[in-house]
Amino acid sequence: MKKRKLILEDGTVFNGTAFGSDAESSGEIVFNTGMTGYQEVITDPSYCGQFVTLTYPLIGNYGINRDDFETVTPFIHGLVVKEYSEFPSNFRNEETLDEFLQAHNIPGIANIDTRKLTRIIRKHGTMRAVMVDEQKNEQHVIEQLRLAEMPRDQVKRTSTIKPYVVPGRGLRVVMVDFGAKHGILRELTRRDCHITVVPHNYSAEAILRLKPDGIMLTNGPGDPKDVPEAIEMIKQLLGQIPIFGICLGHQLLALACGADTEKMKFGHRGANHPVKDLLAGKTYLTSQNHSYAVNVSSLVNTDLELTQIALNDDTVEGIRHTAFPAFSVQYHPEASPGPEDTNFLFDEFLNLIKASKVKQGGEVYA
């Protein structure tokens, strides 16, 4: 099989076997510790522009199916695995992982020490990396990699271009798409919401014209500070319409309320991150994927209350506004993949909408 190199900006070189596309690619290298759900991970728009290292040692053994996509077009720039299974065995399998990556021009590399790679990322933090043919001059590639600028327009790439409607008979929810997973849409449709999905740069005025009962701020890739128009939009909507933010949406809500965000050393990516609910006194297992987090000290002197923390490192995992009907979480309550411990948050969102409508003297249709 064809050989390929994975080269990190710190000069570390991994020699492995190529699969997927023959294209050369660069991106930020991260790792995900989930044992299953590689299809959902690969198609999660929040990984836009990244090389995803899967720490579970065997990947591809159940192939790719049409049911588990989180977006139609994957946005990852590369896939890194220990061992790639060429012959998947699963009753839902429709194509191999290799065929899927080839179809979307995404390179992969296998037969490298993913434990060593993960330890490097944990020690030194996420960094730029490149996948190239084994013949390339390593020193030249490293020099070019260190000079490369990482893109900052990931949300623009992953957001819908124009609004569309997913009809339902219940509450009217406007979903602001920063790179939304289909799992969020599925949870709202299961609850019979009438959903209007709008682009990331939609104005507050345009959203209010849709007469929504609630606003969903979705997940998405990159630095929340790269989406200033969304922060301004949220500021204008606060207090008018109930808001629920997930992942990037959580960070944007925090920024809109005067808090701050910061980049983490290597982020949270996996399906078993424990989170403590400070209000309920309960602990949940959660699915997570984020490089940025809300700075806990920045919550002081804002109208935000800390509601949940990560048990591994005390990262802010949940906040709520003390005056307005708005709350958010850093993790993914829709899972996809992962545990569904916090799926009830979608019901809490709808209950918040209903309570707000009753308070305002309006009718509740669901």
UniProtKB/Swiss-Prot annotation:
Catalysed reactions, as listed in the record: hydrogencarbonate + L-glutamine + 2 ATP + H2O = carbamoyl phosphate + L-glutamate + 2 ADP + phosphate + 2 H(+)
GO MF entry, a single one: carbamoyl-phosphate synthase (glutamine-hydrolyzing) activity
Stretches for region CPSase: 1-171
Residue intervals of the Glutamine amidotransferase type-1 domain: 172-359
GO biological process, one term: 'de novo' pyrimidine nucleobase biosynthetic process
Summary of the function given for this chain in its UniProt record: Small subunit of the glutamine-dependent carbamoyl phosphate synthetase (CPSase). CPSase catalyzes the formation of carbamoyl phosphate from the ammonia moiety of glutamine, carbonate, and phosphate donated by ATP, constituting the first step of 2 biosynthetic pathways, one leading to arginine and/or urea and the other to pyrimidine nucleotides. The small subunit (glutamine amidotransferase) binds and cleaves glutamine to supply the large subunit with the substrate ammonia.
SUBUNIT field: Composed of two chains; the small (or glutamine) chain promotes the hydrolysis of glutamine to ammonia, which is used by the large (or ammonia) chain to synthesize carbamoyl phosphate. Tetramer of heterodimers (alpha,beta)4.
Protein name: Carbamoyl phosphate synthase small chain
